[in-house]
């Protein structure tokens, strides 16, 4: 049977002009600025206009530990938002922006799939409204001003061996992880070791996603710890006078982007930090604006619940957000993977039952936050009746509801049962609570996450990490939340330990101090903030035909 690709489905869709979508949301022409026919930037004055309006319900979409191709969080997010609208509710999908790195790498785009996509899919996946370019430019402007300051006499006495900020680009390129700059003649600047991160791991990206407004963004940029001087004192971005120029570069990027789903449900897409090497959530501004404009906001946090959801709750929600439900996305194929099955397309109830331990642990973890939990099974044609029956029994035996959804093939219609469940189970207020208190030292926060969420026996700290812990305390940052950076494929810091491993320890190899963003990143194991391309990158299949038709995106 012929199955159209995601990009083919998106290209055949009949989109409504973004002005029509905006009008349905109750917006006037003064509330947004169009970027072509089908995209717009939302004005931040909407907060003032809607300040007396009650916030809508906030639903988080997360997942089990994924396979390399992902489990369909974005697809389920879009499907649920459309399903809510199908049953007469005013829902908005609020998502992260795709990064070009995975687009051209292994994972592909981040606009959903099948008949549960945000559109125009090709434009969203390729550059969109230019936010990532602004973030990249802003980050690299700080680096350029800092290196120029050193070259022009170094009045701040910056120690070239203690520079913390790295340049960034929105591409997977391992060759740029560690480089030497300033090589050659004296006029080329001071020679020093440097490196690149992918844009989504930069502190500017985190700041965009946690700032309340442009003023807050500018203040946070000024607080970025870029280096230490030769006496060991901190040097900030404001010290090289970069904060004003960076705020100027980010003036338009801070505004959330409005698009639509294939069924014309509004979608706000803004910011895009990865959840394995950053905090993994779309912008606070987008989420809060969605809560003012819709009765239900379906948002997401990257990768598995051990990464994205934990950071959503313990970092993002500390900014006056109260989640009403968490939806864990799982697939039978991924559970069979966690059960060590060799062929995911062949019925294997035994492997499914073994792999269920991964989902079970995520369910238990999410319940620790005192938020209602539902499991959404992203249905595939290869799922058998026996597997469906067994998974339903396993989930319900643990006191949770499992709902099979076919949003890829049916769009919002395939999520109506899930939508009804969400509406019914978000009527009452819950007792949401954080996993840890901010007054705990960073070390104890890490140990709590490791033991409560990952189920590790303990935490080891490298000599480098111990030195940084002392530095963090001296800087007065022990009361910051912690952002764990580790592999997405396992509860542990070893990607080969799939399922629900026990009897392991995690190793904190280093720390990254994100003073402007307002958290401390703990780097676990061998995690890297600049990915590399796979042996056969998806870029090899991407093209544009003579008539402008895009091919190869997924």
UniProtKB/Swiss-Prot annotation:
Q: What class of enzyme is it?
A: ligase
Query: What pathway or pathways are given for this protein in its record?
Result: One-carbon metabolism; tetrahydrofolate interconversion
Q: What does the UniProt keyword field contain?
A: ATP-binding, Ligase, Nucleotide-binding, One-carbon metabolism
* EC numbers for this chain: 6.3.4.3
Cross-referenced InterPro entries: Formate_THF_ligase, Formate_THF_ligase_CS, P-loop_NTPase
Q: Where does ATP bind?
A: 67-74
Q: Does the keyword Ligase apply?
A: yes
> Which BP terms in the Gene Ontology apply to this protein?
tetrahydrofolate interconversion
Gene3D superfamilies for the chain: Domain 2, N(10)-formyltetrahydrofolate synthetase, Formyltetrahydrofolate synthetase, domain 3, P-loop containing nucleotide triphosphate hydrolases
Name the chemical reaction catalysed here.
Answer: (6S)-5,6,7,8-tetrahydrofolate + formate + ATP = (6R)-10-formyltetrahydrofolate + ADP + phosphate
Q: Which GO terms describe its molecular function?
A: ATP binding; formate-tetrahydrofolate ligase activity
Q: Which family does it belong to?
A: Belongs to the formate--tetrahydrofolate ligase family.
The protein's matches in NCBIfam families, at most eight in alphabetical order, are given as: PRK13505.1
Q: What is this protein called?
A: Formate--tetrahydrofolate ligase
